[in-house]
A protein has these predicted regions:
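Bacterial N-terminal signal peptides that target proteins for export
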Residues: 1-8
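C-terminal motif of bacterial Sec signal peptides marking the signal peptidase cleavage site
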Residues: 18-20
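Catalytic and substrate-binding clefts that recognize carbohydrates or anionic sugar/phosphate headgroups
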Residues: 24-205, 212-213, 218, 225-227, ...
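Glycine-rich, histidine-containing beta strand-loop boundary motifs that form or position
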Residues: 76, 140, 150-153, 161, ...
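Catalytic core of carbohydrate-active enzymes
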Residues: 124, 398-410, 417-428, 441-445, ...
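A conserved hydrophobic secondary-structure block that centers on an alpha-helix together
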Residues: 126-127, 201, 211-259
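A residue-level signal for conserved active-site and pocket-lining positions in enzyme catalytic cores
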Residues: 136, 187, 191, 228, ...
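Aromatic- and carboxylate-enriched substrate-binding clefts and catalytic-loop regions
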Residues: 234-510, 545-546
Length: 659
């Protein structure tokens, strides 16, 4: 009896110890690198489980092994088969980043799930698990001193942002990279050095994009283009969703609705439009279908745990999915674009690439599916490669498009991505709702994506799901004209959401809003050049004007476009404006102060902002005549930067630009 009591007491102590501690601490190795970057390796780190790094393009240069000299403290542990990394930081630190998420700009107190998912209307997990994964946190402390933390890990993971930053992964032990700088701007630049920056996009992609699920047949596409020009509404791009395909089979064209896609694209080009066409990863499993047959010959498909080909239902029915961990598959996929682009296609839209799979519990393929890999990427299960599936797809697409059109800059838009994927594609924030809530949410969402290294982003203007009201659309297009990526999009079965669909007042608001964007193209293009060279975001939180000012840290309705323009939406309530004489400016003769919809645009004291002449297409873009808006500071001085090149091709890499 005494033995039993002692045993029970011992078990109680053990359970108490497990409850209070819960985690098995592990040792670590710290590598000090240039530029105030430290890399932390847990004792159980297996390089083969994380090589190559999908996030890091340029490995930081080690200086020497040192004791932890960082103001942050990193620790590793194991708990219930999960690998955990925790980062402790000081008081009064505001946290940002974590990629594409719903909620406030400041992420303190939030938990984010990193498992890319098709999240229609952001209904799953309250929008804390969306289409992309960015294992990255930006911290801003007192006096603006800042840090950034990367969990270099693709496996399924959660980020909890409490008194400590906690990364909890279902995969093997992973390394953590910490950046410490004097300002968030310097942290973003260092992130750009590590992950790479965007390539300078074609100028036309900075224009306005009109999309719908779906514009068909081809005569409707032509009519849309004609109406845009007739109504003098600035627009550069018209988009084709899946209904252009033959029975939803990728790289095909419907023989009735789009019998001659080359002629359709030629018509758009003649009227100064570009076209973007959708390509999904799901391939109809059908003998005789050329995409399936050619992939079958090289064993291109993701496999099940039992080594059979995985079949999942998407739009065409039973589909197979390319295994992009194999170099031969990536090359094969890229080669499919040659004939496709030869039909006059200008850009590509990679959708459904989480990958989305219908009629499954989690709307994707099983964790246990197998990726074959090769000498470059190790074979492993889908749990490891799920979050980078879309990233691998868009890299393969981009490479194929470049090979097809070597003299043109590629444009790819993706729904799914991962930290570092900005190198290959722009992104939008997925299937939002036509609601004032989602309009307001679009600002912190786009800002946190921007603060996670993805500068070329924006939501569906007007909202994708549901029906926009005239008032909602007017508010959205008025603000949406200032998103880095400006595209209107709506779902099948919803009302038409073209600028003229809501009556004369909204049509006028839309025209004026887009005229503002197009006159700002010299400034906007310069911001993209800056981002391509430094990693700085195009759309920035207001606190970037003065990171030491605590009162600016929570502002999530107003936002900066670059460093010189502050956008203040009409629905902004008690929005914070930085100190100094920020002046309200007119870009195209509009008077925003008393307007119901147009946001106020304020210029920073000491800034010079260039404008081009009014145009409706970037094909007419010219700097032969420019207008300068000059705002003198208290010292009666001002300065600005203007970058210019041909807007297409790669001559700028050989010095063919003006600065």
């Amino acid at each position: 009896m005494k033995y039993t009591k002692n045993l029970l007491y011992l078990l109680f102590l053990v359970s108490l110890l497990i409850t209070s501690c819960g985690e098995k601490q592990t040792k670590q190795t710290i590598i000090n690198c240039d530029s105030n970057v430290n890399i932390y390796y847990p004792s159980g780190y297996d390089k083969s489980s994380h090589t190559p790094s999908f996030a890091i393009l340029n490995e930081p240069s080690p200086v020497e092994k040192v004791l932890d000299s960082s103001s942050l403290k990193v620790s590793f542990s194991e708990f219930s088969d999960r690998q955990i990394a925790q980062v402790s930081f000081g008081s009064n630190v505001d946290l940002y980043g974590t990629g594409e998420v719903m909620g406030d700009l400041i992420r303190n107190g939030k938990t984010v799930k990193l498992w890319n998912t098709d999240n229609y209307g952001y209904g799953k997990d309250n929008g804390q698990r969306l289409y992309q994964s960015h294992p990255w946190v930006l911290g801003v402390g007192e006096n603006g001193k800042s840090f950034g933390v990367i969990a270099d890990n693709t496996w399924k993971m959660e980020i909890s942002l409490g008194e400590r930053i906690t990364f909890s992964s279902e995969g093997p032990a992973f390394r953590v990279i910490v950046i410490e700088k004097d300002s968030p701007q310097e942290v973003m630049k260092e992130l750009g050095k590590l992950t790479g920056t965007i390539e300078l996009p074609p100028l036309w992609s900075l224009g306005f994009h009109q999309c719908r699920y779906s514009y068909y047949p081809d005569e409707r596409v032509k009519s849309l283009a004609d109406t845009m020009r007739l109504k003098n509404i600035p627009c550069d791009v018209i988009w084709m969703d899946i209904d252009y395909m033959q029975n939803f089979k990728i790289f095909t064209f419907d023989s009735i609705h789009f019998p001659n896609p080359k002629e359709t694209n030629d018509y758009l080009h003649k009227n100064d439009f570009k076209s973007v066409w959708m390509i999904d990863p799901g391939i109809k499993a059908e003998k005789g279908f050329f995409v399936y047959d050619s992939g079958e010959k090289i064993n291109a498909w993701v496999q099940t745990r039992n080594d059979s080909v995985f079949l999942g239902k998407v739009w065409p029915g039973d589909c197979v999915f390319p295994d992009f961990t194999q170099s031969k598959v990536s090359k094969w996929w890229g080669g499919l674009y040659e004939n496709f682009m030869a039909k006059g296609v200008d850009g590509v839209w990679n959708d459904m690439n989480e990958p989305a799979v219908f009629e499954t519990v989690d709307w994707t393929m099983p964790d246990s599916n197998k990726h074959v890999g090769d000498e470059n990427i190790k074979n492993d299960i889908h749990l490891r490669y799920h979050n980078v599936y879309g990233m691998m797809m868009v890299e393969s697409s981009r490479n194929g498009i470049i090979k097809s059109n070597p003299d043109k800059r590629p444009f790819v838009l993706t729904r799914s991505n991962f930290l570092g994927g900005h190198r290959y594609a722009a992104t939008w924030t997925g299937d939002n709702n036509s609601s004032m809530k989602h309009l307001k949410q679009s600002i912190p969402m786009s800002l946190n994506l921007s603060l996670s290294g993805q500068p070329f982003n924006g939501p569906d203007i007007g909202g994708f799901a549901g029906n926009a009201t005239p008032e909602l659309y007017a508010h959205w297009i008025a603000v949406g004209a200032f998103y880095p990526f400006s595209r209107a999009h709506s779902t099948k079965g919803s009302i038409n959401q073209e600028p003229w669909s809501f009556g004369e007042e909204v049509e006028t608001v839309s025209r004026e809003a887009l005229q503002r964007r197009y006159r700002l193209l010299p400034y906007l293009y310069t911001l993209f050049w800056e981002s391509a060279n430094t990693g700085m975001p195009v759309m920035r939180p207001v606190f970037f004007n003065n990171p030491a000012e605590k009162y600016l840290r929570t502002e999530q309705e107003n936002f900066l476009l670059g460093s010189d323009l502050l956008i203040v939406p009409k629905w902004s309530e008690n929005g914070q404006i930085p100190a100094g004489n920020w002046r309200n400016i007119s870009i195209n003769g509009e008077k925003s102060q008393n307007h119901k919809y147009h946001p106020d645009v304020l210029i920073r004291p000491g800034a010079i902002v260039p404008l081009c002449n009014p145009i409706v297409s970037t094909n007419s873009f010219s700097l032969d005549t420019i207008t300068l808006i000059v705002s003198l500071d208290s010292n009666l001085s001002a300065k600005g930067i203007l970058y210019s090149d041909l807007g297409e091709g790669y001559g700028y890499q050989d010095g063919e630009f003006s600065l």
